[in-house]
């Protein structure tokens, strides 16, 4: 699959996800319209929707895409919540996200915290809603997968390690663990939850989990490379902050060239897990290539 085709798939998946989110929020009622507007500002504020595309692609590979859009939307809500909190002054103190003002700059810190909290809970509301996800057994699996991916043994734990690693000089294994939790856990959840809702067998899920573990690690390395090699007006967020804050990442630990080689090796290992699927695995394989070659 060439780069034009995979770009078209990502754009198509992003449009479907955005349309679903637009419709979901269109008539959303709340005691506070400001909170709803803040939530919409974040989750509908552009973005590549790579995680959504991973959900949808994994569902297609596993057999059935038709019920996967709500899962993709829930993942994007959680991702937006994580970005809101990452940008706060107490975390990464970033005033730019996706080329626009970060939520706490657009509104205020308190509203940003509450909007992030609300987006997280709304994601679980979607997954646990019998009118949206009609298979109660799958509901349980989806909720369990996402809750583990974003809690203390997932994204939140990884963010804590990221903060603890500033100016401490983590070794390779410590950086690897941080990445696997902070970034990799939600990437893995996107793929595995896509397979769950798509009806994938345990064998398929196991292969896709192995694929996603390597993919998540490579994804964060690619992000770190962009942080030192790109410009904020291109990627839509401040660059160079990891170096300024002496963060523990692969670039600071082993240098740009070795980190880039590791990322490419990880992508190859990830794609090897898809060989058994033949042509059905081409879409996820191309997504893996996109992740390592992207410029934003």
Residue ranges: model-predicted function:
Residues 15-16, 25, 29-275, 279-295:
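Mg2+-dependent prenyl diphosphate-binding active-site environment of isoprenoid biosynthetic enzymes
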Residues 1-25:
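N-terminal amphipathic/basic leader segments beginning at the initiator methionine
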């Amino acid at each position: 699959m060439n780069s034009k085709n995979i770009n078209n798939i990502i754009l198509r998946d992003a449009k479907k996800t955005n349309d679903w989110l637009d419709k979901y929020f269109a008539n959303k009622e709340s005691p506070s319209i400001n909170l709803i507007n803040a939530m919409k500002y974040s989750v509908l504020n552009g973005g590549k929707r790579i995680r959504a595309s991973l959900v949808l692609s994994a569902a297609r590979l596993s057999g059935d895409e038709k019920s996967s859009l709500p899962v993709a939307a829930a993942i994007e809500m959680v991702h937006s919540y994580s970005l809101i909190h990452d940008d706060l002054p107490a975390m990464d103190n970033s005033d730019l996200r996706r080329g626009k003002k970060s939520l706490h700059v657009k509104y205020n810190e308190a509203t940003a915290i509450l909007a992030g909290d609300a987006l997280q809970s709304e994601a679980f509301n979607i997954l646990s809603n019998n009118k949206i996800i009609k298979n109660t057994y799958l509901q349980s699996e989806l909720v369990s997968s996402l809750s583990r991916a974003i809690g203390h043994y997932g994204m939140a734990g990884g963010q804590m390690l990221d903060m603890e690693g500033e100016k401490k000089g983590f070794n390779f294994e410590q950086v690897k663990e941080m990445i696997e939790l902070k970034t990799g856990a939600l990437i893995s959840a996107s793929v595995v939850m896509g397979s769950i809702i798509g009806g994938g067998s345990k064998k398929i899920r196991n292969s896709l989990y192995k694929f996603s573990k390597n993919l998540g690690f490579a994804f964060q390395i690619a992000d770190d490379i962009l942080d030192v090699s790109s410009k904020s007006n291109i990627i839509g967020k401040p660059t160079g902050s990891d170096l300024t804050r002496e963060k523990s990442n692969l670039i600071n630990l082993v240098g740009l060239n070795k980190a880039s080689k590791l990322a490419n090796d990880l992508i190859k290992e990830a794609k090897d897990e898809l060989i058994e699927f033949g042509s059905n695995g081409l879409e996820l394989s191309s997504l893996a290539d996109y992740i390592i070659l992207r410029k934003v």
